[in-house]
Curated annotation (Swiss-Prot):
One of its GO terms (cellular component) is cytoplasm. Gene3D superfamilies: HUPs. It is found in: Cytoplasm. This is Caffeyl-CoA reductase-Etf complex subunit CarD. The gene is carD. It catalyses: hydrocaffeoyl-CoA + 2 reduced [2Fe-2S]-[ferredoxin] + 2 NAD(+) = (E)-caffeoyl-CoA + 2 oxidized [2Fe-2S]-[ferredoxin] + 2 NADH. Its cofactor is FAD; AMP. It comes from Acetobacterium woodii (strain ATCC 29683 / DSM 1030 / JCM 2381 / KCTC 1655 / WB1).
Length: 262
């Protein structure tokens, strides 16, 4: 079995700041990390590999050259191969163009039985790319997956719902997007880190995956980010106290009436 995991290097959102004048993200000095949901997808692939000898785990990302560091982390965790789709032509891609590039890369990789991706990336929160890749590859897709079992060339998964979960059976090959409740990603071992720097990372540009410059990046993006901004800070809340429940309730009702809320 061959499992391909789509991963993304993202800025650590705990460190992100917005330039108040330009409305753009300040990336200088902001550390980059493996997107958390993608780490869950990778762990799911590695668990399947542990349970099914002979399984290969491949990781693919689209990004700048420095994204190779994130791929080495994935190799250190236990992935077998890594592919970096990197080209200036890919710059400025929205989700539609990103999915086109990743789908083209996946097609170039030899037979893949299962594609895993995180539910969404923390730098965009769109949750669109996984489903778009599946559509381009003509694969069935299940989103918000919180449990995976592989049996007889099919995946039996639990799809997270607001009030529980659905049990879905889907034939392979398919694409699954994973949520954090699926697992706890493993840590890199010292030996794994050392081995990761000995392994090659395959780098492909737009020509390698058969895309023209007009079919990827900003040129192929029907949507563009107009502005990014931090929402205005809200004032602190007010604590209502009293000696009895009725007194507190009465004070609350009075304040709500003063503000014409009720």
């Amino acid at each position: 079995m061959r499992i391909l995991v789509c991963a993304k290097q993202v800025p650590d959102t705990n460190e992100v700041k917005i330039d108040p004048k330009t409305g753009t993200m300040i990336r200088e000095g902001v550390p980059s990390i493996l997107n958390p949901d993608d780490a869950n997808a990778l762990e799911a692939a590695l668990v399947i590999k542990d349970e099914n000898p002979g399984t290969e785990v491949i990781v693919m990302t689209m990004g700048p050259p420095q994204a190779s560091e994130m791929l080495r982390e994935c190799l250190a965790m236990g992935a077998d191969e890594a592919y970096l789709l990197s080209d200036r032509a890919f710059g400025g891609a929205d989700t539609w163009a990103t999915s086109a590039t990743l789908a083209a890369g996946i097609k170039k990789v030899k037979k893949v039985d299962l594609v895993l991706a995180g539910r969404q990336a923390i730098d965009g929160d769109t949750a669109q790319v996984g489903s778009q890749i599946a559509q381009r590859l003509k694969m069935p897709v299940v989103t918000y997956v919180e449990d995976i079992k592989i049996e007889d060339k099919k995946a039996i998964v639990h799809r997270q719902m607001e009030d529980g979960y659905e049990v879905i059976e889907v034939q392979l090959p398919c694409l699954l997007t994973c949520v954090k409740e699926l697992n706890d990603p493993r840590y890199m071992s010292v030996g794994g880190i050392m081995d990761a720097y000995e392994q090659p990372i395959t780098i492909w540009n737009h020509e390698d995956i058969g895309l023209s410059p007009e079919a990827c990046g900003l040129n192929a993006s029907p949507t563009q980010v107009f502005r990014s901004f931090s929402p205005p800070a809200k004032g602190g809340g007010e604590m209502i106290t009293g000696t009895t429940v009725n007194e507190v309730a009465g004070s609350l009702v009075s304040k709500l009436k003063e503000k014409h809320i009720i």
